[in-house]
């Protein structure tokens, strides 16, 4: 596992479009969330210990913020051929195991990950109602083995600010986790 930080996409960036299949094969796009007050996009996978570590907290965050008109979408861009634990079939199992109530999408070509300049799992992006990036960073300070409870404190603070019509803090700590498992020859040029 290569420990990789987020590239910290510039704040104010417009949400790149996507049209990807969910675990039932339904195509989900950015436009499907047009009426939401905020959109959280999480690049994630099934096997990374950093994602596994926060999955309960991520599932709880979805339960807590869905009633507040917040949408969450998970996107798996890992190479499923070389990492079969991240295959679409295993993603469907992960949705059930983790209790995710949000769409979990498969980015087979890895083009969407590149549009977002995603680097790691988890890599978290929060967009306001105008779909401008207002937060990109860690879920919270908890990491596997550091003894800090998983709370989602950093992302929750950013969500609460957006929902209250306030600015998010400019001090944002990069997310860190396993690198996205790029297909051979498809590695991005932004590293």
Predicted regions and their residues:
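Chalcogenol-based redox active-site neighborhoods
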Residues: 1-172, 179-191
